[in-house]
């Protein structure tokens, strides 16, 4: 998968994601951005919330469990500008039994974004030279 971020103005960047998707990332005006899109750290929280929701829904579907809409909320705690804590709330239907609930809470920790945040990925920054 390839993702490319290109500066628009100030800190605003248009992001192209393989598959034809586009979005804008920016910083709030309070730190010099123009607030034309969510900040990268807010996008990280959004990625976690949506990844958990999709993972839980896919698992329940494979098991034949009727979930209806799942709601996931993420509270992000910071140390300075760095997000250090993610508290995830998973709202499940009251009709599920205790074992189903327990299983879905475990499955929520198996989503790819959760795994990355838990330190299971490697990030390497390399310089790419422009062609002359």
Please annotate each region the language model reported.
Residues 1-46, 54-132:
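Extended beta-strand/beta-hairpin segments
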């Amino acid at each position: 998968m390839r993702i490319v971020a290109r500066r628009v103005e100030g800190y605003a960047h248009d992001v192209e994601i393989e598959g034809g998707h586009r979005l804008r990332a920016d910083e709030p005006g309070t730190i010099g951005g123009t607030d034309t899109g969510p900040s990268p750290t807010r996008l990280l929280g959004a990625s976690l919330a949506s990844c958990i929701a999709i993972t839980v829904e896919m698992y329940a579907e494979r098991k034949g469990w009727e979930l209806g809409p799942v709601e996931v909320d993420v509270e992000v705690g910071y140390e300075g500008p760095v997000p250090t804590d993610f508290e995830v709330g998973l709202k499940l239907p009251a009709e599920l039994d205790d074992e189903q609930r327990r299983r879905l809470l475990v499955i929520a920790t198996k989503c790819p974004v959760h795994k990355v945040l838990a330190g299971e990925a490697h990030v390497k920054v390399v310089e790419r030279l422009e062609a002359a």
